[in-house]
């Protein structure tokens, strides 16, 4: 889950929960690139919390993970049309990583 909103702390994120019950040894921030407290769309959360979402870095990080793992399961945030930045939505992220 590269972008998550509605998590009070990193150790309370969805990814932390998955990591707890899996064999992953990497730190959560190795997989999770943007975490927000507000339980709203990523763009809205980033504006409220004044934290920029670096879309191109997220794509780059995911492509790096693709080289390290045989299989990636990537959870989005809401539906396909959920805004990530002012110009990018979840559907764009899917297209960017194929």
Regions of interest found by a model, annotated:
Residues 1-52, 56, 61-64:
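N-terminal phosphate/diphosphate-binding loop that engages ATP/GTP or pyrophosphate donors
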Residues 28-29, 70-72:
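Structural motif
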Residues 57, 64, 71, 76-98:
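Conserved catalytic-core segment of NTP-binding enzymes
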């Amino acid at each position: 889950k590269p972008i998550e909103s509605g998590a009070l702390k990193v150790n309370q994120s969805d990814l932390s929960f998955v990591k707890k019950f899996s064999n992953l040894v990497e730190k959560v921030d190795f997989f999770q690139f943007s975490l927000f407290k507000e339980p709203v769309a990523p763009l809205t959360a980033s504006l409220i919390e004044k934290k920029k979402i670096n879309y191109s870095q997220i794509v780059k990080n995911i492509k790096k993970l693709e080289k390290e793992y045989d299989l990636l399961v990537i959870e989005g945030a809401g539906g396909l049309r959920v805004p990530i930045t002012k110009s990018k939505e979840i559907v764009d992220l899917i297209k960017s990583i194929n």
